[in-house]
């Protein structure tokens, strides 16, 4: 089946669109990437998304208008690739996350992804699966991360323990134990590790007065000095790093509010030193999760997402994990930039075939669930 996956991460850089040929289901799952492209949002739409994600108040009318505008952008992105690469049988659309509230104190969590699935189905004329997180949340789960259910079939190993580390706006991991014993599937874990590129990108935008949106290759940060005392304070004073999994987070915690809270301390540093320290914090937060919550350090970390291109960040990760091999998912057959969109395509494919898409051991849900609402063109 040819399936098109759509997703835009918390950084809202653009819409990732992947077309994949999918066969099999789990142990026999086969995914061949046929096409991939990231299609940028119109600047005004991206600005509105980032305002909402930062907590900017909206009326219900404004929120529904934004939902429709994002759906239009997603549908247009899908049609662009379909025109270039041929028809597809199914669309999976994650939408644009603008808020995520994990469950707490016995209350169900909730998560808001904009991009109306029914509108995408109507505009494209193709059955569309969307709203993937709500079924897991309704079962008491975090609703995130969902990608580990796909990672375990595409990136596991018979000979080594692996971590798949996505570094998007937020960092998240999938722990993949060696598959050479009968219970390995039940030991797969995954959760959000904390900041990915979110704090770095926001700081770059501020320090460059809007001229830059990210630190290309980490080159700016690499010229600075790390304020280890400040980095250690962030790690010690943030209770998220002491919270055991399952857990999830978002830009609500690691966004503008974080930078504003620590503005006095950051402003005492040069621009390069600020970026070096924020880069170290991102790397250290990932390693902190490994050391505190994994059964052992992985033999190999497979990195994906935009952070893969930040060489300074990867150097800091390697320095803190000297015995661990660090590679890209590209090296093991999964396109590192298309990986999230591929996963959404697989989740939609599973939903269409009534295969549960969550891992309760990962999300904390009380049981497996069919993920996503299905919208057929009427």
Curated annotation (Swiss-Prot):
Residues annotated for ATP binding in this entry: 9-16
A GO term for molecular function: ATP binding
Homology family: Belongs to the anhydro-N-acetylmuramic acid kinase family.
Keywords assigned: ATP-binding, Carbohydrate metabolism, Kinase, Nucleotide-binding, Transferase
InterPro entries, sorted: Anhydro_N_Ac-Mur_kinase, ATPase_NBD
Role description: Catalyzes the specific phosphorylation of 1,6-anhydro-N-acetylmuramic acid (anhMurNAc) with the simultaneous cleavage of the 1,6-anhydro ring, generating MurNAc-6-P. Is required for the utilization of anhMurNAc either imported from the medium or derived from its own cell wall murein, and thus plays a role in cell wall recycling.
The reaction(s) this protein catalyses: 1,6-anhydro-N-acetyl-beta-muramate + ATP + H2O = N-acetyl-D-muramate 6-phosphate + ADP + H(+)
Record-given protein name: Anhydro-N-acetylmuramic acid kinase
GO terms of biological process kind: 1,6-anhydro-N-acetyl-beta-muramic acid catabolic process; amino sugar metabolic process; peptidoglycan turnover
Pathway the protein takes part in: Amino-sugar metabolism; 1,6-anhydro-N-acetylmuramate degradation; Cell wall biogenesis; peptidoglycan recycling
EC number of this enzyme: 2.7.1.170
Annotated source species: Synechococcus elongatus (strain ATCC 33912 / PCC 7942 / FACHB-805) (Anacystis nidulans R2)
Annotated Pfam families: AnmK (PF03702)
């Amino acid at each position: 089946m040819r399936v098109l996956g759509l997703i835009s991460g918390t950084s809202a850089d653009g819409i990732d669109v992947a077309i994949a040929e999918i066969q099999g289901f789990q142990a026999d799952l086969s995914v061949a990437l046929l096409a991939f492209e990231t299609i940028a949002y119109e600047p005004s739409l991206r600005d509105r998304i980032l305002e909402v994600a930062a907590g900017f108040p909206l009326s219900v009318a404004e929120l529904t208008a934004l939902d429709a505008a994002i759906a239009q952008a997603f549908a247009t992105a899908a049609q662009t690739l379909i025109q270039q690469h041929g028809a597809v049988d199914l669309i999976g659309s994650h939408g644009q996350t603008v808020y995520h509230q994990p469950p707490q104190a016995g209350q169900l969590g909730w998560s808001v992804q904009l991009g109306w699935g029914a509108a995408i189905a109507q505009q494209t004329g193709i059955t569309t699966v969307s709203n993937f997180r709500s079924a897991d949340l309704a079962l008491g789960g975090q609703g995130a991360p969902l990608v580990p259910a796909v990672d375990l079939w595409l990136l596991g190993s018979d000979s080594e323990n692996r971590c798949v580390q996505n570094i998007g706006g937020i960092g998240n991991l999938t722990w993949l134990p060696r598959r050479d014993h009968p219970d390995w599937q039940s030991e797969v874990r995954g959760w959000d590790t904390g900041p990915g590129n979110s704090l770095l990108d926001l700081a770059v935008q501020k320090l460059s007065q809007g001229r830059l949106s990210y630190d290309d290759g980490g080159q700016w940060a690499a010229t600075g000095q790390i304020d280890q005392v400040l980095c250690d304070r962030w790690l010690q004073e943030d209770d998220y790093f002491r919270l055991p999994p399952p857990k999830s987070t978002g830009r609500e915690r690691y966004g503008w509010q974080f930078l504003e809270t620590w503005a006095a301390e950051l402003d005492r540093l040069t621009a390069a030193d600020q970026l070096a320290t924020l880069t170290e914090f991102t790397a250290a937060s990932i390693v902190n999760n490994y050391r505190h919550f994994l059964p052992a350090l992985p033999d190999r970390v497979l990195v994906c997402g935009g952070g893969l291109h930040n060489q300074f960040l990867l150097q800091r990760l390697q320095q803190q994990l000297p015995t661990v091999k660090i590679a890209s998912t590209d090296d093991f057959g999964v396109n590192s930039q298309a990986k999230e969109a591929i996963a959404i395509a697989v989740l939609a494919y599973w939903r269409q075939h009534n295969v549960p898409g969550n891992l309760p051991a990962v999300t904390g849900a009380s049981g497996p669930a069919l993920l996503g609402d299905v919208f057929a063109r009427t």
